[in-house]
Amino acid sequence: MRKCFFMSHNPEEKQSNLDSNHKNESSSNKRIKFKTWQFILLLLGVVIITAGITVAATIGISHKISGLTKDERQEIKKIEYAYKTLNNDYYKKQNAGKLSEAAIDGMVKELKDPYSEYMTKDETKSFNEDVSGDFVGIGAEMQKKDKQIMITSPMKDSPAEKAGIQPKDVVTKVDGKSVVGKPLDQVVKLVRGKEGTTVKLTIKRGSQEKEIKIKRGKIHVKSVEYKKKDNIGVFTINKFQDNTAGELKSAIIKAHKDGVRSIVLDLRNNPGGLLDEAVKMANIFIDKDQTVVKLEKGDDTESIKTSNDASNEAKDMKVSILVNEGSASASEVFTGAMRDHKKAKVYGSKTFGKGIVQTTREFKDGSLLKYTQMKWLTPDGHNIHGKGIQPDTKIASPQYQSISVIPTDKSYSVGDNTKYVKSIKIGLDALGYNVNNDSKQFDTQLESAIKKFQSEHELSVNGKFDKKTNEKFTQLLVEKANKEDKVLDELINKLK
């Protein structure tokens, strides 16, 4: 089985069990990304963060794979000989499957391409589940807060909701095992399981503790959220998965009935997804037989076009697209097509800039090889790879939303001079501690602000930015970002 993928996220950003062999970004380059869904683990078996973009396997240029030359056959024989030798003659017994996986993984790593990777059976399963948006679990959003695992909310009609799970329930045990102080991803692994099996959660609600048995089931995570703000329809599109276009079309019909005639398509921090859904989504606004994206490999070009007329409801609407540096791949395909066809104005900040395509080959054992195969261009032929898409009108995010993630394995104190100190200053200033953030120097003013911060949040008051202070600092910044959206507010004011 073969598919084509645009990998749709920062290739150097560590992802939890999705795209798990992407190179880990050094802590010096990480950025805190603020968007509610990025800080909540859904108990659906995986962490929802990344996706791939699938291109139909019928594209002609994806089939042109030549046979092996004589020299190439010799190289294959060498690999086969090495495999047989190590498997049969090494002084310790070897796992044949792991040897072959290591060989494939080694070939992929030699490409030095962060978008190419070899996935094991389990990694492939998780990846495919993420692309489809269907998962097996209990359907409850949860987060870690002050060492406690707290339910943010059960999803509507989910097993968790039907079992009586409520927002702010604190999970203390899973199947009788304490989860107090455990990392969130470990708790997710305990809660996940096979469809139809039961998990027992011990939850604390107020001063009472109770056990709740929940039967795991299949859950679909919606990728489109709609709200009406000042008579403007705001559609947050988290990623492009199965039926994203259908969800958006239904929401647009509802908005049209509500009298909405101006809409914002919020693609900020949308890492991408299924190309087919990006094309279908563009088709809501763009008429039949219009190019949405061009795929190129060498001298071959394939244009992917719309297949239907645009939605009548969408034709009545003024469309604005909101993007940022986290808008990648399928988000850029859609944004580029909408702008080239003059169907929307683009606001926000420059997009990620992912203009190459990956294809996949699945092995009989369920593992998968993904590698870069071609590039894509916008309908007008623009190559955005490494450049991104510049907005028509720039709306900058608050400074604290793009600070570096501060390593927790180091404590910062008076005399330190590093960009992390500047991040601390920017963050504390955003939290209301009136810190001058013009320099990277850890000065006495910052020390005083940290002491005040520590005192107000029941931390050890030492004036040092230590691990516990760092964790509380990050938690509060995330909460602040999730409560306010100055970029969207500014755009709404422009559109009124």
UniProtKB/Swiss-Prot annotation:
CDD domains: cpPDZ_CPP-like (cd06782), Peptidase_S41_CPP (cd07560). This is Probable CtpA-like serine protease. One of its GO terms (cellular component) is outer membrane-bounded periplasmic space. Residues 10-25 have a biased composition (Basic and acidic residues). Residues 124-206 form the PDZ domain. It comes from Staphylococcus haemolyticus (strain JCSC1435). It is found in: Cell membrane. The keyword Ion transport does not apply. Belongs to the peptidase S41A family. SMART domains: PDZ (SM00228), TSPc (SM00245). Its EC number is 3.4.21.-. It holds the Pfam family PG_binding_1.
